[in-house]
Amino acid sequence: MIGSLQSIDLPMRRFREYEEVDYAIVGVGSAGGVLLQRLARAGFNVVGLEAGPFWDTERDWVSDEAGSHELYWTEPRVTGGSDPLALGANNCGKGVGGGSVHWAAFTPRLHPSDFEVYTRDGVGADWPITYEDIKPYYEQLELEMPVAGPAYYPWGHPHGYAYGPHPMGGVGDALIKGCTALNIPVSIGGPVAILSGSHGDRPHCIYRGFCIQGCKVGAKASTLVTHVPDALKKGAEIRDLCMVSRVELGQNGRVTGVHYYDIDGHTHFQRAKAVILSGYAIETPRLLLNSACPGFEHGLANSSGTVGRYLMAQAGNVVMGRFDQPVRMYKAPPAHALTEEFYETNPENDFARGFAIQTVGPLPVAFGKQMIAAKKAWGWGLRREMMDYNHWAAFGLLGEILPWKDNRVTLSEDKDRFGLPVAHVSFHLHENDKRLIKAAKEKTEAVMHAGGATEVVQEARYAHLVGACRMGADPRTSVVDKFGRTHDIANLFVCDGSVFPTQGSANPGLTIQALAARTADYLITQGDKIFTSNERDMASAPIRRELAPPETWGKGVPRLK
């Protein structure tokens, strides 16, 4: 199924191994793809190193749940703690495009409150940036992907979307009916980064249901189709099937490049004036810990002891309801209706922060697994449930689990195929988390019943790993500053979901890409100072650049006035 870049006819610049590039980006996913494009368009020499393959969307992506297994990071990891996370297909992507290849493409923004959780609610942490700092990049990325959604989105910072919403499927109808019966506001038709009209050479969504299998038709946005092609056109290089093993620190206290293994297990060293880590919430801290060296014996850029700590996952329970009439939840994008009415802290609750309720659309194999988990169905019992698939609807709750110091990534004694220590992930729910999840499950089940379900069951699960290299103003309690530069090393940056201090109850994909665009603007604004100076310009705002080529987003079908 998988083919390396060498078998894909994609012209690109090739840097010689001895050449020193301006930026080496580790991981070409949601953040890495945006960074690669921005920096290449600004004229920098940039190489992206990706552990997975460079996907050929026609050859490698299939309308089949089992056949999409290799889209995910399924290499060994160790999981533990009192509430261990299931690591693998639900959390991490592998290959160019990263998690944006298999995301469902829900793209809500974080709320203004998410950036000052500690100040407002006395829990979690504040971000070193505000909603206003990232708002222009939300708007920019919503056009670039583009995002389809309602004309008015009422929660957080109210706003609308330039591209009209998708039609409702059966699951959306059930959510609307349930919310309406309980007087709960609901958003219809998005926001979702799936085309509701033709867009350049990308077609309208055909509502086939295989969104998290890569989207063979190209209607769903991923950086593989939205940003990487332009990056290559502007001189970037991507080396796929290259596993970065260590970031090298020079005697002058600055990084000099990265060591990596190719597909044959041969070792290489890519020299770089600056390095950006975009490997996400497990692989980025794992790489920093594996890069321990004299002066940083407990992990590179880890003078605070914070690398790997404050890992977060959202509560992602799936509530399923059976309806007398067919629902056919595979029709329409899985992500097409939601409510964030319970997102913010309510003083009447016995917990801080909140949750969202969204439509989801598990395909038959995933549905079967959920029936096993929720109803202990097996054998003929499972067969009966599977035969009833068209009558079931599924809602997913997204609950904000707070950042806790003991939820962390460390190194295991186990080794991967390259001999590198694999990640050990320890996760624990605290009392606030448990109370929030209990309330969220009860509310989601109530909405399902109000929507007309005659039977309701639920599966406990988690979604969306973030944190473990948090950003902050204090070098004693965080890993990077507000622009993603590590506090300890002036030419080493982290830009991915691992920098989140808190996570809200919104899917993180849009925020990850918006942060990448903001970091890129900062790097471009600073220019060669990034490569030569240890001084940090924290006062100058990044100059916002409309670097996305108009031809990539200007030909869509805008909302009718």
Describe the function of each predicted region.
Residues 1-23, 41-42, 525-561:
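Extreme N-terminal leader/targeting segments of oxidoreductases
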Residues 20, 188-195, 203-211, 218, ...:
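A glycine-rich dinucleotide-binding beta-alpha-beta segment and adjacent secondary-structure elements
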Residues 23-48:
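N-terminal Rossmann-like FAD-binding beta1-loop-alpha1 element of flavoenzymes
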Residues 38-41, 45, 52-62, 217, ...:
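Glycine-rich loop(s) and the adjacent beta-strand/alpha-helix scaffold that form part
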Residues 67-155, 345, 405:
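Redox-cofactor-proximal catalytic regions of oxidoreductases
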Residues 83, 118-244, 465, 470:
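Conserved redox-cofactor binding core of oxidoreductases
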Residues 84-90, 127-131, 304-423, 477, ...:
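FAD cofactor-binding and catalytic pocket of flavoenzymes
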Residues 502-521:
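A conserved FAD-binding loop/helix module that cradles the flavin
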